[in-house]
């Protein structure tokens, strides 16, 4: 605990919160081109092959985006839109790729939470 004189000499510094999605530059979404599409394994208690893509954004950032939903059509040079939102069990994945936007197709046969996966309303 500092003394009063110590606090007068150098007051307490306000801690700045760091940006969790710096590549978006305060935009809701950003467009980019896939440079690599691959699968990776999650952290310790979980086990799966998670689909991710390395994306070069229009502002020059290179980020890793998660591809949500079952099945996808992405490959190298696909143009995608990313949004913020990390994947807790994949270190370094701080962005999500939007389904049903630009080159990314929506999830097939999706009945619930369709808007999250770019799926059209079933007839």
UniProtKB/Swiss-Prot annotation:
PROSITE patterns: RIBOSOMAL_S12. It comes from the Bacteria. GO terms for cellular component: small ribosomal subunit. InterPro entries: NA-bd_OB-fold, Ribosomal_uS12, Ribosomal_uS12_bac. GO terms for biological process: translation. Keywords: Methylation, Ribonucleoprotein, Ribosomal protein, RNA-binding, rRNA-binding, tRNA-binding. Pfam families: Ribosom_S12_S23 (PF00164). The keyword tRNA-binding applies. The modification 3-methylthioaspartic acid is found at residue 89. GO terms for molecular function: rRNA binding; structural constituent of ribosome; tRNA binding. Belongs to the universal ribosomal protein uS12 family. With S4 and S5 plays an important role in translational accuracy. Interacts with and stabilizes bases of the 16S rRNA that are involved in tRNA selection in the A site and with the mRNA backbone. Located at the interface of the 30S and 50S subunits, it traverses the body of the 30S subunit contacting proteins on the other side and probably holding the rRNA structure together. The combined cluster of proteins S8, S12 and S17 appears to hold together the shoulder and platform of the 30S subunit. Part of the 30S ribosomal subunit. Contacts proteins S8 and S17. May interact with IF1 in the 30S initiation complex. PANTHER family: 30S RIBOSOMAL PROTEIN S12 FAMILY MEMBER. This is Small ribosomal subunit protein uS12. It comes from Methylobacterium nodulans (strain LMG 21967 / CNCM I-2342 / ORS 2060). The gene is rpsL.
């Amino acid at each position: 605990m500092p003394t009063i004189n110590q606090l007068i000499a150098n007051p307490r510094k306000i801690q700045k919160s760091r940006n969790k999605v710096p590549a978006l530059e305060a935009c809701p979404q950003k467009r980019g081109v896939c440079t690599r599409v691959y699968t990776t394994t999650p952290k310790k208690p979980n086990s799966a092959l998670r689909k991710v893509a390395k994306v070069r954004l229009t502002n020059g950032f290179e980020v890793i985006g998660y591809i949500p939903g079952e099945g996808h059509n992405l490959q190298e040079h696909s143009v995608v839109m990313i949004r913020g939102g990390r994947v807790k069990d994949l270190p370094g994945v701080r962005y999500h790729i939007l389904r049903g936007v630009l080159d990314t197709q929506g999830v097939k046969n999706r009945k619930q939470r369709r808007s999250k996966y770019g799926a059209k309303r079933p007839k």
